[in-house]
Regions:
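Conserved SAM/SAH-binding loop
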Residues: 8-12, 26-28, 71-73, 155-157, ...
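Feature captures the FAD/FMN-dependent oxidoreductase FAD-binding
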Residues: 1-40
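Glycine-rich dinucleotide-binding loop and its adjacent helix/turn
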Residues: 43-105, 109, 120, 153, ...
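Lumenal/extracellular "mature" regions of secretory-pathway glycan-modifying transferases
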Residues: 30-36, 52-79, 113, 126-154
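C-terminal, flexible cofactor-proximal segment of oxidoreductases
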Residues: 227, 241-355
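Short hydrophobic core segments
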Residues: 11, 35-49, 83-86, 176-186
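Glycine/threonine-rich phosphate-binding loop and adjacent beta-strand/alpha-helix elements that clamp
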Residues: 183, 188-267
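A Rossmann-like FAD-binding core segment of flavoenzymes
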Residues: 101-206, 269-306, 312
Length: 355
């Protein structure tokens, strides 16, 4: 494998040509560019490389500091007393827990921090106040641990006024916030594809319109368009494939399986992937049942690619059924014990880690 891997190399441009894909790459050591032509491209640059900070009206009025959760390391290095965390999924909840002294990992001054964390006031902005965190304690629940009840839950930010105060959807205001931590996810980065090139000028991966915020920039967005039912192959040209787009999954087994399936399709060892019930939500397990007679077009844009536990089981089992039978156990359907362990993930985490 080392013979075909180029380390410290950045892909700066990839475009369709008559005999394949012309890829321009740049060596970060020599600062020199090279051009190669390939039969197919598999984009596997991950879901967590381009942090997303949403556009909030008046954000330039904010007088404190800002950071994305991707840049967070330890709570004692933040040097802030009044902190707002925007987002209530895994990263936001983990950071809020550590800031309030509920940490379980050990670092140089973790015990000292747990004592001094009482001097920090933590606010957490939920997108939907009616919904408690899916996989964490609810700070508003009296039965939650003491560290959790220290978190002050607020709604989504509506705007920031000229005095630098944060105004929320219910009209509440927060002043003198030292630090905003944006736990607002990541964008898919396709900066090496140019919108003016074929076939993207006809069937763009990223579309910006007035109704949705699908495109934060011309090269990155939270939504990709014109993919097949499986969120893998680019429909106008299946020689372009994306690996690892689904979220809320166990990533390594799924990515390994997608890669194997993509290789089989591109090498002609199995037919193109069949249609499924694409009009059903991505998180619905029933969606991932093969529907060979489905002629209805699937949606042109996939939202946030959230698959989820039960749908992941059917998604992977169906993909496995398309591959030639193999002997190694890693290419078998998820065994019952593994499915049960996944279903009890939150319960096991609280039992073993305390949160």
């Amino acid at each position: 494998m080392l013979d075909v891997i180029r380390f410290r190399t950045e892909v700066v441009h990839a475009r369709r040509v008559q005999n394949g894909w012309r890829v321009t790459s740049r060596s970060l050591d020599e600062q020199s560019e090279s051009n190669d032509v390939f039969d197919a491209i598999l984009v596997a640059n991950g879901n967590c490389a381009t942090p997303h900070i949403p556009s909030v009206p008046g954000l330039d009025h904010f007088r404190g500091r800002q950071m994305h959760s991707a840049w967070y390391r330890y709570p004692d290095t933040l040097n802030a007393r009044r902190i707002l965390i925007v987002g209530s999924n895994s990263s936001g909840s983990d950071i809020a827990r550590e800031l309030c002294g509920g940490a379980v990992r050990q670092w140089r001054i973790s015990e000292e921090w747990q004592r001094s964390s009482e001097n920090v006031t933590v606010y957490q902005s939920y997108h939907d106040l009616a919904k408690p965190p899916k996989s964490d304690y609810d700070p508003r629940d009296p039965a939650s641990p003491a560290w959790c009840r220290r978190i002050h839950v607020v709604g989504p930010i509506q705007h920031i006024d000229e005095q630098g105060a944060l105004v929320f959807s219910d009209g509440a205001r927060l002043e003198d916030i030292d630090l905003i931590i944006w736990a607002t996810g990541f964008l898919h980065n396709v900066s090496f594809f140019q919108a003016k090139d074929e076939p993207f000028c006809q069937a763009p991966l990223i579309v910006h319109n007035q109704q949705t915020s699908t495109a934060a920039t011309i090269a990155s967005a939270d939504t990709l368009h014109h993919l097949d039912d499986w969120m893998m192959f680019y429909k106008p040209d299946p020689s372009l494939c994306f690996i690892g787009l689904p979220k809320h999954v166990v990533p390594f087994p799924l990515v390994q399986l997608q890669s194997r399936v993509a290789a089989h399709v591109l090498l002609g060892k199995i037919p193109p992937l069949p249609r499924v019930r694409a009009q059903l939500p991505i998180s619905d397990p029933e969606r991932w049942i093969i529907d060979e007679y489905n002629e209805a077009p699937g949606p042109e844009a996939w939202g946030n690619f959230i698959l989820g536990r039960e749908a992941e089981f059917v998604y992977t089992d169906t993909l496995l059924s398309l591959l030639p039978r193999s002997q190694p156990p890693e290419w078998q359907p998820f065994p019952p014990w593994r499915r049960e362990l996944r279903r009890k993930g939150i319960e096991k985490r609280r039992e073993l880690l305390g949160y």
